[in-house]
Amino acid sequence: TPMTTRVLFDFAQQLTLLDQHELAVQFLDRTVAQGGDNHSTAYFRGNAMKFMGRMDEAEAAFEHSIALKPDYSHAHWALAFLGRKTGAEQRVERLRALLQRTTAADADRCYLDYALYRELEMLGDDEGAWQSLERGFQAKRRSVQHDAAAETALFDQIIARFPTVPRAFSTTDDAATPIFIVGMPRTGTTLLERILGNSLSITLCGELNDLRMQYKWATDNYCPGFFDEKSLARAGDADYAELGRRYLDHVKWRAPGSRR
């Protein structure tokens, strides 16, 4: 039975998350061939082309996405951040007109402001760029329901729940040993990863969700973030050796033949 366009598109999305961009494009092509040519398909195609370094095709795909859905903010944002000065004046006019008439929610509108910021910055209009960036940040902040007190309380619970590190288990001789790089954004974690990746014995895997998902499996609780109160309450009953084995089993395909 042929796959539906929805299934094909979902496969392409997952392949993109796995950095399998060439294969993702094949699924996107099949999606379009079966009648699934829409703004989302074009947008994901543009992202895949960007990651493969095929910038002309990425630009064409983002423009196609905008042609299919003129107010699709993510396509405008992605197009602007390709960093192409050619056509920037026309894109600025298009963005300003769209921002004047849009009724998009703040969560979407902020990407239009970000796009305008980037285009104006490329054109040397620093004052206009800053104003657009500020509006985008304000819109984004309005859309984020952040509770600092609740987050602090959650970290306090984590510290109280894990006063010591659970005992490690022995891996088999042929198992790769994971290296975790921990740090806040913009603190050099990516640079450190690239430095380590220069070793032939180390395979770069980027930012993975596997450990987080295995913790959810071990505590039999799903939540949007890594922890919530329910999963922390179950932390004492989790089998961490099993969690570790499952994690290694789920990521081993990423590093065939590597030691780290």
Task: Kindly label every feature range from the protein language model.
Residues 15, 49, 82-83, 113, ...:
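Residue at a conserved register position within TPR or TPR-like alpha-solenoid repeats
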Residues 169-260:
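Phosphate-binding active sites in nucleotide-utilizing proteins
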